[in-house]
A protein has these predicted regions:
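Signature of Gram-negative outer-membrane beta-barrel scaffolds
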Residues: 393-453
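Flexible, glycine/serine/threonine-rich loop segments and coil->beta-strand junctions
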Residues: 109-131, 137, 144-190, 199-216, ...
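Short, acidic, small-residue-rich periplasmic hinge/interaction motif at the N-terminus
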Residues: 20-23, 32-34, 65-69, 81-125, ...
Length: 453
């Protein structure tokens, strides 16, 4: 009879205690508590208390684990049947995660060349400067050309001008920065979500003049996924080197299956500082506004948006040209319609994207202290693109109409252009070798206005 009672006592051995935060001295709930080497465990209650029964009669190691705190273990050496260890305090730990990209189709983002460069998240925040070129200047194969800080333009693998493409979400940016060194890229980096430098076969998906590659910019526009509640975020910055400051604020408001997104940006930059002092007539002012609405469903989304960007900047003077410099005013308005759909009817393809875009760009150049524009440039671009995308392939088509208008002391005639394109991309893996192939067929008509005079 005594032997039986002894076994019962061993089986009912129990340990209890409390778990607290060493930082705040408050109780911790849902801490995982277990005996190493045994299938015995529990979790702490709201007051931090815990209790484990039927523990082994030998000495044992008791472990405590919860996200945000260091793993803690205590060794219990006692012959007592009822064990109370009092309070256990856990130390905070710093969580260090790799960058996480959230998207509707992360599996479709693997089609890229080893020579590609991608900046997003904290990387683009750390390297953010006023212009695209200045933000990318430390990347491999990137150089800068400029006529003042506002007009800085990237040089990609030694090529400039129209030897590579600048795109916004896969379609042309819509400005005239490639036509002259004093034309600024119509982009403020405070609104950029990511920048991708694309080389190799995949570059043909964006256009035909991609000898050096493509720089594709994705802005903080309509997100791929709907927020569960209203969300606000912003970016502020300043520099005492050129007495500049900037701010960008974005607000998302979800309701039912819809979401409204609105954002505004402002940047003021003083004169560029050189080793010889301030370079006159190099200051700039950027202002922008974006508004859009999107509808989300289980297998897709549809959105429409409008964006406005104005840039007023100066070009420094030179003895060979305008001694006092040139002032330039630029305005670009972009309207977008986007439709994304998950598909199953087309083998090997998972998504279909349709995008319509209209860009109205205007650009006036003034001699400093003059009230009339010496040069007046503008263009209107209408684009319609459809694209099917799979894990290792893309096919699509593009229709684009462009109307170029020039006035003042500028002798390029007004011109109409029509571009029809068919493009495709395929990737195939053979053991340790990945092959990529792409093709693009374009039909382009250029019709300048003529005069009998």
């Amino acid at each position: 009879m005594l032997s039986v009672l002894s076994i019962v006592h061993a089986q009912n051995r129990k340990i209890s205690g409390f778990v607290f935060s060493g930082q705040t001295n408050s109780s911790l709930e849902n801490v995982n508590i277990f005996i190493k080497g045994e299938d015995i465990g529990t979790s702490s209650k709201s007051d931090g208390s815990f209790s484990l029964e039927n523990i082994p009669f030998d000495d044992f190691e008791l472990s405590f684990r919860i996200i945000g705190y260091e793993d803690t273990s205590v060794f219990v050496v006692t012959k007592d049947v009822q064990i109370s260890i009092g309070r256990i305090y856990l130390k905070l730990s710093v969580l260090d995660f790799e960058e996480i990209h959230v998207g509707a189709h992360p599996e479709l983002g693997n089609i890229q060349s080893l020579s590609n460069i991608s900046l997003s998240g904290s990387a683009i925040q750390e390297k953010m400067k006023g212009t695209l070129a200045a933000s990318l200047q430390n990347e491999t194969g990137i150089a800068i050309t400029s006529m003042g800080q506002a007009t800085a333009r990237p040089i990609l693998r030694g090529y400039g001008g129209d030897r590579f493409l600048l795109t916004d979400g896969g379609l042309e940016l819509g400005d005239l920065s490639q036509t002259s060194g004093d034309h600024a890229v119509s982009m403020d980096m405070s609104s950029a979500q990511s920048v991708n430098i694309i080389r190799g076969a995949k570059a043909l998906l964006f256009g035909s003049n991609t000898i050096a590659g493509v720089i594709d910019i994705k802005k903080n526009s309509l997100p791929e996924l709907q927020f569960s509640r209203s969300h606000f975020h912003g970016v502020l910055g300043a520099s005492n080197g050129d007495n500049s400051s900037f701010a960008n604020a974005v607000y998302h408001y979800p309701f039912k299956n819809n979401q409204i997104t609105a954002s505004a940006l402002s940047r003021n930059t003083g004169e560029q500082i050189t080793p010889k002092g301030a370079l006159k007539n190099t200051s700039s002012i950027n202002n922008g506004f974006f508004a859009g609405i999107a509808n989300y469903s289980n297998n897709g989304r549809t959105g429409i948006s409008i964006e406005s960007l104005t840039m007023d900047y100066g070009i420094p003077g030179s003895p060979e040209g305008h001694i006092n410099g040139v002032d330039i005013e630029m305005e670009k308005i972009t309207q977008k319609f986007e439709h994304h759909r998950d598909i199953t009817f087309f083998p090997n393809f998972k998504t279909f994207d349709l995008e319509q875009r209209f860009v109205k760009y205007e650009h006036q150049e003034y001699e400093t202290k003059k009230t009339f524009a010496a040069v007046d440039l503008g263009q209107q671009i209408f684009s319609l693109q459809g694209k099917f995308t799979g894990e290792d392939r893309v096919i699509g088509s593009l229709f684009q109409y462009r109307k170029f208008i020039a006035g003042g002391f500028y002798w390029t005639p007004n011109t109409d252009e029509i571009n029809l394109s068919l493009f495709g991309f395929r990737e195939k893996e053979f053991n340790f070798v990945t092959l990529q192939a792409s093709s693009r067929v374009e039909f382009l008509t250029v019709k300048p206005e003529t005069s009998n005079q």
